[in-house]
């Protein structure tokens, strides 16, 4: 089946699930995103299980009904078969199948172990919870206190009216049985990135807290292709403000999903749920145990092997929140306990506008502290960071130059993020760039404007523009008013400015003229000025005449 058809069918299924939620009064409710993402994932894991079972036992490949064939299989043989499945496949009981729920949705005679009636919505909820518990070790993420956050929770709890709970769950199961993911499992990152973005697009808006800023795929792909060139294997990738995982997923795809292990932390429960879904869809189940829900700045949870300090990572990417109120934690962050990590300082609490506290400066320092001796990093920062003349921003820039760990900077077009009007740049760090040149690029004039949701304006980069940015940066190629390569000494001579524009050569075009040509040009300019002055006097007279006709009535 063509990829376009698969995409259309998958999006239609997502839309149908959202319609069901709307029909039961759940459209736009806090619980809607949990229902949609959990039901989508239940369907995906169920179909993935059947897909992998066929690969493990070729005799099942031609079964007319794979679920019936599995149900008829002796229990010991079934258990052996599930043990043959890879670690990225959820283990399902025969009663977990979607077909089982579909076939039992109208059976009023079903009873619980204690003999009481077993309403269908309870059967549906119990199935989800049992799948989550059976796969707790593999598919869980964790809190900072190492408590496991399971894969599924009951969904009928979001329907307020008891009589409608079974109807809601029947509508869901009837929709799931119509669709199959069988054709998608051979698809790669680009397909799942598109589907994931479509799935969460209604639930990733206007959050405004840690890392819940959605990073455009263009930015993620630029970062990934600049950071990773050539073969890389057995490396670690980290994002301390991971959000839904766009940056780490793009980087993992560039490295190779089997060649890296992802580590993340984020304070947002919703972001961590989205990230888990994203990792599962992109064959990175082996990294789920490294997804932590907690405050990175106060309680960074990824420690070194001796557990006596923070872990260091080969690659770090992040689009941290730029400004937010962390006044309650400010003094603790500025204490001696964190002094080494926040070497350039911690922003003070302002008397007004606490929401404007520059928290991104702490994330930059945390990333520098967490970078391995040969590590590389890319951080999305407000463009004002590049030229700030004093304070913490300048101290950080001075440190990067002193330690010879700056690879370069790309200043992006305005409104590249639809959610913020702040101009942004990408700061690239490389601990091995001790003696190399630093690449400064001004891509702010690229892109075209488009409306998002009929409201916000966003700048979109074309494929050619993205390629130009990547190729020019990686080649270290100077280009007038676009890209320049400078030395660390050059940067020190410009007060540690990271702005490309301050290093561009100012060019004055000289044209050779004969005395006659010079006289002719000057006469032409004089004639033009005379005409403009005459027109100005005419307009002045006309305005005076019109004013003279104005009378009081």
Regions found by a protein language model. Name each.
Residues 1-222, 227, 296, 411-414, ...:
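Non-catalytic, mostly N-terminal accessory regions of nucleic-acid modification and defense proteins
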Residues 2-4, 308-553:
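A conserved structural/catalytic subdomain of Rossmann-like adenosyl-cofactor enzymes
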Residues 29-32, 36, 214-218, 266, ...:
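Short, conserved micro-motifs enriched in small and acidic residues
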Residues 43-49, 53, 203, 231, ...:
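A generic secondary-structure signal for well-formed alpha-helical elements
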Residues 167-171, 212, 264, 352-356, ...:
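Alpha-helix N-cap/helix-initiation motif
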Residues 209-318, 323-339, 381-384, 392-396, ...:
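Conserved S-adenosyl-L-methionine
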């Amino acid at each position: 089946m063509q990829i376009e058809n698969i995409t259309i069918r998958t999006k239609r299924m997502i839309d149908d699930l959202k319609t069901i939620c709307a029909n039961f009064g759940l459209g736009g409710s806090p619980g809607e995103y949990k229902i949609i993402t959990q039901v989508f994932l239940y369907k995906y894991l169920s179909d993935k299980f059947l897909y992998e079972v066929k690969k493990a036992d070729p005799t099942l490949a031609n079964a007319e009904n794979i679920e019936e064939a599995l149900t008829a299989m002796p229990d010991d043989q079934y258990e052996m078969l599930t043990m043959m499945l890879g670690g990225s496949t959820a283990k399902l009981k025969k009663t977990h199948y979607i077909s089982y729920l579909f076939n039992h949705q109208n059976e009023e005679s079903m009873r619980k172990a204690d003999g009481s009636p077993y309403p269908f919505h309870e059967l549906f909820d119990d199935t989800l919870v049992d799948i989550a518990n059976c796969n707790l070790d593999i598919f869980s993420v964790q809190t900072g206190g190492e408590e496991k956050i399971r894969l599924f929770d009951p969904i009928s709890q979001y329907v307020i009216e008891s009589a409608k709970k079974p109807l809601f769950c029947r509508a869901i199961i009837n929709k799931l049985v119509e669709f199959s993911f069988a054709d998608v499992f051979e698809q790669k990152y680009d397909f799942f990135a598109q589907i994931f973005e479509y799935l969460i697009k209604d639930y990733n808006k206007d959050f405004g807290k840690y890392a819940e800023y959605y990073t455009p795929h263009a930015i993620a792909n630029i970062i990934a292709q600049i950071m990773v060139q050539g073969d890389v294997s057995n490396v670690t990738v980290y994002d301390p403000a991971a959000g839904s995982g766009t940056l780490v997923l793009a980087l993992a795809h560039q490295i190779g999903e089997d060649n890296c292990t992802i580590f993340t932390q984020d304070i947002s429960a919703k972001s961590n749920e989205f990230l888990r879904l994203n990792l599962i869809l992109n064959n990175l189940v082996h990294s789920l145990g490294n997804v932590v829900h907690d405050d990175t700045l106060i309680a960074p949870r990824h420690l070194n092997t001796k557990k006596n300090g923070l872990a260091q990572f080969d690659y770090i990417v992040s689009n941290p929140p730029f400004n937010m109120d962390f006044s309650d934690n400010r003094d603790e962050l500025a204490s001696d306990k964190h002094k080494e990590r926040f070497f350039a300082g911690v922003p003070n609490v302002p008397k007004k506008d606490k929401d404007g506290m520059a928290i991104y400066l702490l994330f930059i320092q945390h990333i520098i502290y967490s970078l391995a001796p040969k590590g590389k990093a890319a951080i999305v920062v407000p463009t004002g960071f590049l030229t700030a003349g004093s304070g913490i921003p300048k101290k950080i820039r001075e440190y990067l130059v002193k330690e010879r760990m700056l690879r370069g900077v790309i200043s992006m077009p305005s409104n590249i993020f639809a959610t913020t009007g702040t101009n942004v740049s990408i700061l690239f760090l490389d601990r091995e760039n001790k003696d190399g040149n630093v690449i400064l690029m001004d891509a702010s004039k690229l892109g075209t404007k488009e409306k998002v949701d009929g409201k916000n304006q966003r700048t979109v980069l074309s494929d050619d523009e993205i390629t130009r940015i990547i190729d020019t940066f990686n080649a270290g190629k100077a280009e007038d008013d676009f890209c320049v390569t400078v030395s660390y000494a050059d940067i020190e001579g410009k007060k540690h400015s990271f702005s490309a524009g301050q290093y561009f050569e100012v060019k004055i075009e000289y044209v050779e003229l004969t005395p006659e040509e010079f006289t002719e040009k000057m006469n032409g300019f004089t004639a033009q000025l005379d005409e403009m002055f005459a027109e100005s006097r005419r307009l002045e007279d006309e305005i005076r005449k019109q004013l003279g006709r104005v009378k009081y009535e």
